[in-house]
Amino acid sequence: MNPLLSFKDVSKGFEDVQILNEINIDIEPSYFYTLLGPSGCGKTTILKLIAGFEYPDSGDIIYKDKPIGKMPPNKRKVNTVFQDYALFPHLNVFDNIAYGLKLKKLSKSEIKRKVTEALQLVKLSGYEHRQIQGMSGGQKQRVAIARAIVNEPEILLLDESLSALDLKLRTEMQYLLRELQSRLGITFIFVTHDQEEALALSDYIFVMKDGKIQQFGTPIDIYDEPVNRFVADFIGESNIVHGTMVEDFVVNIYGQNFDCVDMGIKENKKVEVVIRPEDISLVSQNDGLFKAKVDSMLFRGVHYEICCKDRKGYEWVIQSTKKANVGSEVGLYFEPEAIHIMVPGETEEEFDKRIESYEDYHHA
């Protein structure tokens, strides 16, 4: 089956600044996708190109096997929820949601039915006659989403839609968005710079930097198997250290050999090693793979964040449910599966091949 939407070598610049560089992506129907990256990486530009608010300088955008790169926005089965909601302040909730339906000249009874259903979906039943000015940020966000889904788009675009909400409201909206996407079966494309939000919401994530896709995959794939230092550092907390590949399943870190689960890398190849803080355990000095001294400890609510320095002066961050005494000597332990090897300069295609060969080896 062909993708619902594809970018084919799409580039876009503004004046002398290149924003997107030969972007290639495929969007399948009925999934929740997230474009994740820092400010200025090009993620919102991709959203604007999908919506038709901008046109590509080169390459093309294919929707259901037809090029739409130059198609005007009103001809696309796409709706957008903006960061600032873009609601009409002089219209009440009902009229805001009904606006697009009235333009389509639907009957009053059909409009009322659709608006009522949309309000039920976003859990705002009974709010039809409320004025926009008197609503909270979370309520305005729900109205904006209802206005988008009432038009039954095939793709719903969400541009940093939760960033203005406080933590509790943002969490509630995350649950609502996932519930809506599952129930309606609409393809969602969500833009955010918030890594936790992307991991929680998405079926698939595009990680972006400097106008290029760094990695594409499921949240678990990207978290567990980052393709490069940027992805590893951007997605969650990481201990990233230099190492040398001794042979398949053995890596040398700072002069000490460790068992790992990576293979297919040349012997003596310089690599970068990622170990997540939650994968490191504090143990007795005798039980540790190496020894370290506790430098500091912060309470983060669900865990303690403990910073240690090993005897060679390298720092390690550990997330533990157990306290540690600052200044104490401890052992650090992690399983071979906790070690992830990254090869500097390796492309995503090369990385994927290496991971596949490792999986084939273990299934043989």
Swiss-Prot record:
Q: Does the record's keyword annotation contain Cell membrane?
A: yes
UniProt KW keywords: ATP-binding, Cell membrane, Membrane, Nucleotide-binding, Translocase, Transport
Q: Domain of life of the organism in this record?
A: Bacteria
- Entry's EC annotation: 7.6.2.11
Q: Which organism is it from?
A: Staphylococcus epidermidis (strain ATCC 12228 / FDA PCI 1200)
Positions bound to ATP? 37-44
Entries under PANTHER family matching the protein: SPERMIDINE/PUTRESCINE IMPORT ATP-BINDING PROTEIN POTA, SPERMIDINE_PUTRESCINE IMPORT ATP-BINDING PROTEIN POTA
Q: Which family does it belong to?
A: Belongs to the ABC transporter superfamily. Spermidine/putrescine importer (TC 3.A.1.11.1) family.
The subunit field of the Swiss-Prot or TrEMBL record says: The complex is composed of two ATP-binding proteins (PotA), two transmembrane proteins (PotB and PotC) and a solute-binding protein (PotD).
Subcellular location per UniProt equals: Cell membrane
Recorded GO CC terms? ATP-binding cassette (ABC) transporter complex
Q: How does it sit in the membrane?
A: Peripheral membrane protein
* NCBIfam families listed in its UniProt record: potA
Q: Where is this protein primarily located? A: membrane
> What would be one Pfam family of this protein?
TOBE_2
> Could you tell me the gene encoding this protein?
potA
Q: Which Gene3D superfamilies match?
A: 2.40.50.100, Nucleic acid-binding proteins, P-loop containing nucleotide triphosphate hydrolases
Limits of the ABC transporter domain: 5-235
Task: Give the taxonomic lineage as stored in the record.
Answer: Bacteria, Bacillati, Bacillota, Bacilli, Bacillales
**In its UniProt entry, what is this protein called?**
Spermidine/putrescine import ATP-binding protein PotA
Could you give a GO molecular-function term held by this entry?
Answer: ATP hydrolysis activity
Q: Quickly give the catalysed reaction.
A: ATP + H2O + polyamine-[polyamine-binding protein]Side 1 = ADP + phosphate + polyamineSide 2 + [polyamine-binding protein]Side 1
Q: Record's SMART domains? A: AAA
Described purpose of this protein according to its UniProt entry: Part of the ABC transporter complex PotABCD involved in spermidine/putrescine import. Responsible for energy coupling to the transport system.
